[in-house]
Amino acid sequence: MDAGSPENTVPYINKQLIAELHLCYPEVDLQMVETAYGAMSCIYAALGKKFIVIIDEWDVLIRDEATNQSVQNDYIQFLRGMFKGSEPTKFIRLAYLTGILPIKKIKTQSALNNFDEFTMLDAKIFAPYIGFTETEVRTLCQQYHRDFDEVKRWYDGYLLGEYHVYNPKAVVSIMMWGDFQSYWSNTGTYEAIRPLINMNFDGLKIDIMAMMAGDKVKVRTKSYQNDMVSFKNKNDILTVLIHLGYLAYDCKMKMAYIPNEKIRSEFVEAVEENHWDEFIEFERKSRDLLNATLDMDSTAVAENIEKIHMDYTSMIQYNDENSLSSVLTIAYLSAMKYYFKPIRELPTGRGFADFVFVPKHEYVNIYPALLVELKWNQSAETAIAQIKERKYPSALESYTGKILLVGINYDVKTKEHQCRIEEYQC
């Protein structure tokens, strides 16, 4: 049945529920009652009956009628009448609401503050039930003869509590059809990405590009109003993208990131369709850096990293090796067409490699793997020596393609980068 229009949704819900309640409890006079919660209150007063209320997709009006303030106000008032305060606890035994967004905020407070919320920011005990856990995916891969490492690379990424959680639609589809593609976007609110990431908030575009390159970015989630219009800064945009599932969230580090290969491809498509001038120019410079790396042109690599740092990431203040790694991550953004997300701190023979870029399978015979070691106020030669001494290439012993060793150093006194590149000889 259909309410006919968004404006008629709340009156329609009240009318239908009152009619159904009258059929179930004809002995209770509901003729003067105007709301569903008023009817439940009358039934409780007369018969002592309590109700279980389940609302699926509670937030559909918040999302689909984002700019219709009148409809949203009517709906929020309906929910407040149904659930807020002590009166509803008399006639409601249990209320269970599902949706994408948390409960709408009025100013800084939840419109319904007597609910326990389980969200993509903090799933609590529901974490293992939001999607398939890694253990479940591993079992399914054995059952359906799929490569678990590939499934993990393409569809893992959501970290909820202690659980790695996979999108159930994507997992079921890959088990059934065996083709690594973006099953996810067909079921999500993909059209929401483009207007969101195109909003002109300070620092938003550079954060999006950093995450596309494989980095994590800090995000403050408290100011988000849990709707699709009340955005005040980049943190609100990043937070809604977390709730929509397009970003994952590390609750310990308070950082957002793109969870996996397939969602990263969605961001690339959205950014390209938006025709960001910043992205087009940045990608060109990043491509120059990648080409210089592949050509083993150490001087050009150092110059390009310097240029990218000055032009695009000047807000990152160089003060240690970690800040250098942040610049390096975004500098190699163009590599993401041919390489999987860079692996940070990969365990190796004796220690951890700073960055490892592994080509996608279709590019293994075209592009080399890159082992990158960073140094701060030392030398590029020291970085290369450490790669060899600590046997970092052993981490890629099953890799059959070419491997380049890349050492990068930043000299605090000269304010310059240095680079050295060698081909690994087994």
Question: Where is each model-derived feature located?
Answer:
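Phosphate-binding site recognition
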Residues: 1-320, 335, 339, 343
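Active-site metal-binding core of divalent-cation-utilizing nuclease and nuclease-like domains
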Residues: 42-47, 336-366
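Structural motif
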Residues: 52, 368-372, 404
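Mg2+/Mn2+-dependent nuclease catalytic core
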Residues: 72-78, 376-393
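Metal-dependent nuclease catalytic cores in nucleic-acid-processing enzymes
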Residues: 81-89, 239-247, 329-334, 386-406
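Feature representing long, continuous alpha-helical segments
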Residues: 322, 326, 330, 353-355, ...
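Conserved catalytic cores of phosphodiester-cleaving nucleases, focusing on short active-site segments
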Residues: 328, 353-359, 367-376, 390
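Domain-level recognition of nuclease-like catalytic cores that cleave nucleotide substrates
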Residues: 395, 401-426
